[in-house]
Design a protein with these regions (language model features):
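Bacterial N-terminal signal peptides that target proteins for export
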Residues: 1-12
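Bacterial N-terminal signal peptides
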Residues: 11-19
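Conserved functional micro-motifs across diverse proteins
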Residues: 25-179, 184-201
Length: 201
């Protein structure tokens, strides 16, 4: 027979579990094989890469091409993209099966989260030397910047638009926390956006 203290202990454990943060929809740091295959199958059902819902922040590019923002390229969205590519050309995917499996595993094993920023500037090299950070609970995490994409000319507004990606090792940030994402162009003011990582898959 359990005593009063054991009963209280069980109740307290139940309360603690009830208030644990829900991480099922947080950014995936590690995927088991079932989750990996599920993401690929979801992509196959979507079929068209353009319809893959990559988590996004900032401006809607269809309405404001120079509004600033970007994509949070999670493992799940990357695997869905590969699934869509497989569905688009299944014969080729079957012929190149070893390479396809390698690409899937490489995406699942990625050690860094990539965030790709899109923004505009007045010169072809406007995206060079940009920096990016994540801020969580007062802590700043600096990203490792990649080489920017070649700038494209605009028909109106700033003369050029382009992309640059920043990589953040998974162990350096909390994948379930509200996050402030900031881009620091070499010319002009910094741009910041709020994103709740607990709601991103």
């Amino acid at each position: 027979m359990s005593g009063p203290m054991e009963t209280i202990g069980a109740v307290m454990v139940g309360i603690a579990i009830a208030f644990l943060p829900a991480i099922a929809d947080a950014i995936d740091v590690k995927l088991d094989d079932a989750a990996l295959r599920k993401a690929v199958e979801e992509g196959k059902q979507i079929k068209d890469v353009k319809n893959i819902q990559v988590p996004r922040f900032g401006a809607d590019l269809s309405k404001d091409i120079c509004g600033g923002g970007g994509e949070i390229r999670t493992k799940t969205s990357g695997l869905q993209r590969l699934g869509a590519l497989i569905a688009a050309d299944p014969d080729r995917a079957e012929r190149d099966k070893p390479q396809v499996e390698q690409a899937i595993q490489k995406t699942a094993d990625a050690k860094e989260l990539k965030i790709a920023f899109d923004f505009c500037g007045d010169t072809p090299d406007f995206a060079e030397d940009a920096q990016a950070t994540l801020e969580q609970d007062g802590r700043m995490i600096k990203g490792e910047m990649g080489k920017p994409d070649k700038a494209k000319k605009n028909t109106e507004g700033p003369a050029y638009r382009g992309k640059i990606a920043a990589s953040f090792p998974y162990g350096t940030f909390n994948p379930t926390a509200p996050t402030k994402i900031t881009l620091y162009p070499k010319v002009g003011e910094a741009m910041s956006w709020e994103s709740d990582f607990s709601k991103i898959k």
